[in-house]
């Protein structure tokens, strides 16, 4: 199991300087893995990232959220095509990095929709994601669909919805990405969804209810980590938190970061690393109970 940190904890810019900085700070905070947000996979500097990862002995994963212009759940074939091309380039970036986990809101746009998903849109989404998963499989990459709250997609808001989506596709490298921040909004509890998705769960985000310090909000982390222990989860566990003191203004607005709960990301990151590792250490003792 690798304990990781989202790159946006450290910087809002992923040019060469931002890539190097996020890798360095992720390692200094004690994490094993950095999650790169591929805002533009076509311009991402793979060679700089590879060099920085090798220098600091760090693993990597990558994620993204689609936009209106690349929404694969659209009924417009041109928009779906643009989204699929973006996802394919992201998969290529992962392969070039030597990484194996691609995740995020990659089945629809990451936005507040004003209407339910349509049957035609869902069919387009599944077809595009299936093709991307096939390409990723050829490159040894797992693709995990992030389940997010109702204000960020109209397609996958719960673990059970994700299971139903995956059932039709039936790709062995296609899995589910759960996030405690979103679960706290949409799920009935923090235990059942982990058990329900156990066979498909490939990636986990750890975030507090208010996007701030872990343990200071309403997320039931004790129950969540017990559930991970129950199913023997051993995939990536990645800390995610946002502050407009770091994240670019456009992304801050999209994520609804209207107040900052932290300014010192070094302290925040070190605290999160210790918090997650302490929880994982504790659940190992449950078998002795």
Curated annotation (Swiss-Prot):
GO MF: manganese ion binding; racemase and epimerase activity, acting on carbohydrates and derivatives
Active site: 146, 240
Pfam families: AP_endonuc_2
Temperature dependence: Optimum temperature is 70 degrees Celsius. Is highly stable at 55 degrees Celsius.
Reactions mediated catalytically: L-ribulose = L-xylulose; D-allulose = keto-D-fructose; keto-L-tagatose = keto-L-sorbose; D-ribulose = D-xylulose
pH note: Optimum pH is 7.5-8.0. Is stable from pH 6.0-11.0.
Annotated binding of substrate, by residue: 152, 179-182, 211
InterPro entries in alphabetical order: IolE/XylAMocC-like, Xyl_isomerase-like_sf, Xyl_isomerase-like_TIM-brl
TM spans (from-to): none
Residues binding Mn(2+): 146, 179, 205, 240
Assigned protein family: Belongs to the hyi family.
Organism listed in the record: Arthrobacter globiformis
Binding partners and assembly: Homotetramer.
Keywords: Carbohydrate metabolism, Cobalt, Isomerase, Magnesium, Manganese, Metal-binding
Manganese recorded as keyword: yes
Assigned EC number: 5.1.3.-
Application of this enzyme or protein: This enzyme is an ideal candidate for the industrial production of D-allulose, which has the potential to be used not only as a food ingredient but also as a growth regulator and/or agricultural chemical.
SUPFAM superfamilies: Xylose isomerase-like
Protein name: Ketose 3-epimerase
One Gene Ontology term from the biological process aspect of the record: carbohydrate metabolic process
Details of cofactor binding: Binds 1 divalent metal cation per subunit. Seems able to use Mg(2+), Mn(2+) or Co(2+).
Matches recorded under PANTHER family: HYDROXYPYRUVATE ISOMERASE, INOSOSE DEHYDRATASE
Cofactors that this protein relies on: Mg(2+); Mn(2+); Co(2+)
Domain of life, per lineage: Bacteria
């Amino acid at each position: 199991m690798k304990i990781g940190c989202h790159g946006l904890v450290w910087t809002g810019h992923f040019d060469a300087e931002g890539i190097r900085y996020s890798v360095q700070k992720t390692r200094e905070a004690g994490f094993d893995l950095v999650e790169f947000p591929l805002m533009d996979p076509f311009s991402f500097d793979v060679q700089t990232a590879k060099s920085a990862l090798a220098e600091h002995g760090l693993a990597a994963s990558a994620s993204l959220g689609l936009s209106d212009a690349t929404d694969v759940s659209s009924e417009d074939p041109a928009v779906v095509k643009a989204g699929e091309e973006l996802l394919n380039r992201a998969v290529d970036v992962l392969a070039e990095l030597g990484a194996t986990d691609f995740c995020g809101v990659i089945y629809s746009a990451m936005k507040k929709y004003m209407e339910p998903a349509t049957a035609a849109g869902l069919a387009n989404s599944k077809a595009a994601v299936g093709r991307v998963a096939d390409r990723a499989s050829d490159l040894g990459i797992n693709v995990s669909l992030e389940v997010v709250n109702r204000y960020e997609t109209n397609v996958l808001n719960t673990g059970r919805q994700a299971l139903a989506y995956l059932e039709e596709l039936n790709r062995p490298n296609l899995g589910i990405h759960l996030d405690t921040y979103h679960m706290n909004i949409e799920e009935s509890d923090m235990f059942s969804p982990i058990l329900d998705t156990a066979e498909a769960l490939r990636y986990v985000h750890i975030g507090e209810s208010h996007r701030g310090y872990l343990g200071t909000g309403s997320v039931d982390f004790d129950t969540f980590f017990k559930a991970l222990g129950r199913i023997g989860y051993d995939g990536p566990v990645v800390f995610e938190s946002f502050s407009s003191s770091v994240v670019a203004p456009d992304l801050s607005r999209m994520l609804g970061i209207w107040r900052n709960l932290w300014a010192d990301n070094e302290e925040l990151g070190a605290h999160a690393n210790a918090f997650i590792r302490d929880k994982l250490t504790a659940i190992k003792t449950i078998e002795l109970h």
